[in-house]
Amino acid sequence: MYAFVTGANGLLGSVVVRTLREQGHAVVGSYHSEEPTFDCPLHQVDITDTERVVELLDEYDVDLVINCAAYTDVDGCESNPEVATAVNGTAPGDLAAVCDDREIPFIHYSTDYVFDGETDGFYEEGDEPAPIQEYGRSKLTGEHAVRDVNPDALILRLSFVYGARGDTSDLVGFPQWVASTLAAGDTVPLFTDQTMTPSRAGNVATTTLELLDAGVSGTFHVASQSAVTPSDFGEKICEVIGGDATLIESSVMADLDRPAARPRRSCLDVSNVEGELGCSQPTLEDDLAALEAAFSDYSS
């Protein structure tokens, strides 16, 4: 029997696939466009094509579905709300219903962007969502769609997912951009007025499987203990690679003209997941240390 991972070519999906395989699980993955480089069954599938997904669940006798597929381009969602709703809202509910009918676990990932960011503290799972852009609204629709049809589903909210890919071990996203720009000796403008609790993909994958083993359901926040701005984050990356800190320039969100609004402070409280598993979520320093090998290409 297999674990079925949607979005296997994304950062999070690729790390989930790797972590499952490292723990001895058979995996079948789906991807939307570019095929990842895993030695396991992989299929190009549109996540909104529920009929095709069901065919794969039957073909591989799947006994676990982890939905990593999402439309995560925040500004793209603002311009394409119908696509955002279909991928982030409707499709997760359809998958959750299929899993409920088959009585197999369903795990779905959501986002800190379901909150408006108008807080000076940390959001708990039970706090009232109030998304301020189409991306957050579509992800909240997905949460409701999943919960309405599958009360046993596990929904994990994440914040600013980053890390190294599961298939190639290459650093991607924000840390790769910061590290490569600093290594090239160029300036890096980073926001000082946005605060989040970044979720390292490797920790998310490990925590996901720990929660699965614990047999829990409901909504949990999985993120760093550390509340940081992009500027703070960049400074820590600079320390890791031995870069020139004077290249980091302060910036604010208003400096960029972007279609979608971003929450000012979308920090996630991780007390519930820590209490459930009996261990702490990592600090940013812990997470960056776990990526030491991936940063080595940019170290001076």
UniProtKB/Swiss-Prot annotation:
Pathway assignment: Protein modification; protein glycosylation; Cell surface structure biogenesis; S-layer biogenesis
Catalytic residues as annotated in Swiss-Prot or TrEMBL: Y135
Positions that bind NADH: G10, L11, L12, D46, I47, A70, Y71, T72, Y135, K139
Bilayer-spanning residue ranges: none
EC identifiers of the protein: 1.1.1.-
Alphabetized Gene3D superfamilies for the sequence: NAD(P)-binding Rossmann-like Domain
Residues spanning the signal sequence: none
InterPro entries xref list: dTDP_dehydrorham_reduct, NAD(P)-bd_dom_sf, RmlD-like-bd
One GO term of the biological process aspect: S-layer organization
Free-text disruption phenotype from the record: Impaired formation of the tetrasaccharide present at 'Asn-532' of S-layer glycoprotein Csg. No effect on 'Asn-47' and 'Asn-117' glycosylation of S-layer glycoprotein Csg.
A matching Pfam family: RmlD_sub_bind
Database matches in PANTHER family: DTDP-4-DEHYDRORHAMNOSE REDUCTASE, METHIONINE ADENOSYLTRANSFERASE 2 SUBUNIT BETA
Function: Reductase involved in N-glycan biosynthetic pathway that takes place under low-salt conditions (1.75 M instead of 3.4 M). Participates in the formation of the tetrasaccharide present at 'Asn-532' of S-layer glycoprotein Csg, consisting of a sulfated hexose, 2 hexoses and rhamnose. Involved in the addition of final rhamnose (sugar 4) of the tetrasaccharide on the dolichol phosphate carrier.
Family in the record: Belongs to the dTDP-4-dehydrorhamnose reductase family.
Protein name from the UniProt record: Probable low-salt glycan biosynthesis reductase Agl14
Organism: Haloferax volcanii (strain ATCC 29605 / DSM 3757 / JCM 8879 / NBRC 14742 / NCIMB 2012 / VKM B-1768 / DS2) (Halobacterium volcanii)
